Amino acid sequence: MSAAANAEHGAADRVEILPVPGLPEFRPGDDLVGSLAEAAPWLRDGDVLVVTSKVVSKCEGRIVAAPSDPEERDTLRRKLIDDEAVRVLARKGRTLITENAIGLVQAAAGVDGSNVGSTELALLPVDPDRSAATLREGLRERLGVTVGVVITDTMGRAWRTGQTDFAIGASGLTVLQGYAGSRDRHGNELVVTEVAVADEIAAAADLVKGKLTAIPVAVVRGLRLPDDGSTAHRLVRAGEDDLFWLGTAEAIELGRRQAQLLRRSVRRFSAEPVPHDAIEAAVGEALTAPAPHHTRPVRFVWVQDSETRTRLLDRMKEQWRADLTADGLDADAVDRRVARGQILYDAPELVIPFLVPDGAHSYPDDARTAAEHTMFTVAVGAAVQGLLVALAVRDIGSCWIGSTIFAADLVRAELELPDDWEPLGAIAIGYPEQTPQPLGPRDPVPTDELLVRK
């Protein structure tokens, strides 16, 4: 039966939470089903048996011998956390928030030293859903009853202080009740409501089980939850769907590492306008690039007037066409080369970087004068790269085109700029045209022959 067949997970009636007292201190290899059948012969069809994962771990042999010395015990605990975790989401002090092999996100990969001997540590069950199914089938054979089973562990919750019990294993019930398409009593359609029923049961049962009561098992009675074949694994949100895939500090660190790799040359733009404050902010960040002699060797000219842009690009195209024709290229080849500049017409915004020699040192010889000019050119290049990256981290595309370098006098004349301002290309800016798959960070380039060591 599907979850949709059950219109409401709430009982709208009396629900009981019953303790299961008299259970022994479990050890590896103990018969958990037999102990439960003996302690709770009163189980009925439809009951939900809620079992603390520590009990399952003990019976399944997920107990590790540990030193009694606190420091040595903590060292082992941290090694076990590393072994159990597949990734670390966040760190705060010595606390690690991890994901384990079955996708559970919690502190310390579920490695725990509570409710075990002082020379032991407990690991989570390897497959809690399978453990739940085994318990359910065993009780059906021993007592002739059909129950649901939820295996629980204690975790914290995003946005909330404190911990509560969650379902990490389940069998024989609806673990997730969807209400999308249903209507409330006022006729309002429920759009995204989806209730983690198994988690609600886990939390409710903990009101009876507690932490210090020596009651590791409780029974929730009075719910009407059909077995839709789902398990607790369905409650695990995969990393790619998780809005909190990393902790804050880790997300910031990842963003810093990936910022450079987000930049790529975008040649097709959408018509969506780019907010002016975003461009201003990106330029401000770009201007923090290193520069010689504490100077400001770069100016970014933002060509905002459409008539000015068209006139400038038309004149550059005419000169470029004349130069290529003089080189002996045929008309088709000239057209193909000139067409590459169409991006500067089409981009929503156009910014031209200029080298400005303010503060450059003067030298009596050509060699040092040329070196000074090269130094300023490198500084402008650093600022240009900074601008491209600053745009990319805002999801704004860009493409650096070198054409203005070949028409410096023309560019200065059209934009009415001083004679010592040197254009160093042009930057087309805009939001990238939609693609079937969003473009993520690029892979770093192999350094095999490009990083020379001496």
Swiss-Prot record:
List its EC numbers: 6.3.2.31, 6.3.2.34, 1.3.8.17
Q: Where does coenzyme F420-(gamma-Glu)n bind?
A: 323
Q: Which UniProt keywords apply?
A: GTP-binding, Ligase, Magnesium, Manganese, Metal-binding, Multifunctional enzyme, Nucleotide-binding, Oxidoreductase, Potassium
* Classification via SUPFAM superfamilies: CofE-like, FMN-dependent nitroreductase-like
Positions of region (Coenzyme F420:L-glutamate ligase): 1-247
Which family is this sequence assigned to?
In the N-terminal section; belongs to the CofE family.
Q: What is this protein called?
A: Bifunctional F420 biosynthesis protein FbiB
To which species is this protein native?
Mycolicibacterium smegmatis (strain ATCC 700084 / mc(2)155) (Mycobacterium smegmatis)
- The gene name reads fbiB
